[in-house]
Design a protein with these regions (language model features):
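LRR N-terminal entry segment and analogous cap-like coil->beta motifs
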Residues: 1-30, 34-38, 42
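Consensus "Asn ladder" position of solenoid repeat domains
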Residues: 6, 26, 49, 68-71, ...
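The feature encodes a structural signal of leucine-rich repeats
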Residues: 8-13, 31-34, 51-57, 73-78, ...
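Leucine-rich repeat
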Residues: 14-18, 36-41, 59-63, 79-83, ...
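Solenoidal tandem-repeat scaffolds enriched in leucines and small polar residues
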Residues: 87-95, 105-116, 120-139, 151-162, ...
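Eukaryotic tandem repeat interaction scaffolds
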Residues: 171-282, 288
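Leucine-rich solenoid repeat scaffolds
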Residues: 287-335
């Protein structure tokens, strides 16, 4: 039964053998008690409604997925033991119970005002994705390293001053968000995440990246903007699959020569740093290079065939000869 975004204000009647109910993005404020008796129900989608409470759903033994993002729930729902997907992003639950469905594979608890989570959460060994973003967490315990099947982890927008070395024990392949925290450093063990594709460390207090970052061979996109980096490790040039590197808003004065080895790099954002010079060679495949608001007085004699080069607010001595061809193609922004 599907009726998303239909302007419903009340839960409609459904067949007793219904397997899917999708009532997302309506104006429903209450779920009737009889829903707890829908023995065949496998998936219930109630995202974006006005729910403040739910009946006890623990008896729905067929239920595998429960979507409740964007409601007003003040307490954690009572769920069946075989539940695999639970999305509660953007509610007001405040606390997580000690007992959770042990078979959970996807769990979203972001934006709920959580200050801590129970130890039982870190024992959900079937988890593949975990979203704890936009809470008020101050620590992540070492036992997180036991979530061996985890592919996606979002800890962004919390109050973490550190993360445990055991993060490197995870099997993350898709993404790791640690943005908008209070991190002054990340552990060297992070380099063991050699299959991770996307790493976001933006808006922290990082003064350095670990040398081990060069071992993260699977990285396709790395975002470290809004930190306090003064230099980059030479090992960064070993990231053979990297396509986007976002370093804006740091304190970089120079780049390592090894950056030329990033053969797959297409986007390099270096605006709002303190660069005085660039390496003699830049990645040959680079297409977008943003150098706004640095302290450059000159450019290397050869540049890659860029589609866009932004050089505004630098201190260039005249217009370097190397820009002529790019200017003719309309690829350069100087002022």
């Amino acid at each position: 039964m599907r009726a998303p975004a239909s302007g419903l204000t009340a839960f409609p009647a459904v067949p007793p053998d219904v397997r899917l109910i999708d009532l997302a993005w309506n104006e429903i404020a209450e779920v009737p008690g009889w829903v707890a008796g829908l023995a065949a129900l496998e998936e219930l989608r109630l995202d974006g409604n006005r729910l403040r409470s739910l009946p006890d759903l623990s008896g729905l033994t067929a239920l595998r997925a429960l979507h409740l993002d964007g409601n007003e729930l003040a307490s954690f729902p009572r769920c069946p033991p075989h539940l695999e997907v639970l999305f509660l992003y953007g509610n007001r639950v405040g606390a997580v119970p000690d007992r959770l469905s042990p078979g959970l594979r996807h769990l979203a608890l972001g934006a709920n005002g959580l200050t801590e989570v129970p130890g039982s959460l870190w024992k959900l060994t079937a988890l593949e994705s975990l979203n704890l973003a936009e809470n008020a967490l101050t620590e992540v315990p070492a036992v997180i390293g036991g979530l061996a099947r985890l592919r996606m982890l979002d800890l962004g927008h919390n109050r973490l001053a550190s993360v445990p070395p055991e993060l490197g024990d995870l099997g993350l392949t898709d993404y790791l968000y640690l943005s908008d925290n209070l991190l002054a450093e990340v552990p060297e063990e992070l380099g063991r995440l050699d299959r991770l594709a996307y790493l976001n460390l933006t808006d922290n207090r990082l003064t350095r990246l670990p040398e081990s970052i060069g071992r993260m061979a699977g990285l396709v996109e790395l975002r470290v903007y809004g930190n306090r980096l003064e230099s980059l490790p030479g090992s960064i040039g070993a990231l053979a699959r990297l396509r986007e590197l976002h370093l804006q808003g740091n304190r970089l004065e120079r780049l390592p020569a090894s950056i030329a080895g990033l053969e797959e790099l297409r986007v390099l954002d270096l605006r709002n740093n303190r660069l005085r010079e660039l390496p003699e060679s830049l990645p040959a495949g680079l297409r977008h290079l943003d150098l706004r608001n640095n302290r450059l007085r000159s450019l290397p004699p050869v540049l890659p065939p860029l589609d866009k080069l932004d050089l505004r607010w630098n201190k260039l001595d005249g217009e370097p000869e190397v820009l002529r061809g790019l200017r003719e193609r309309g690829c350069v922004i100087l002022r």
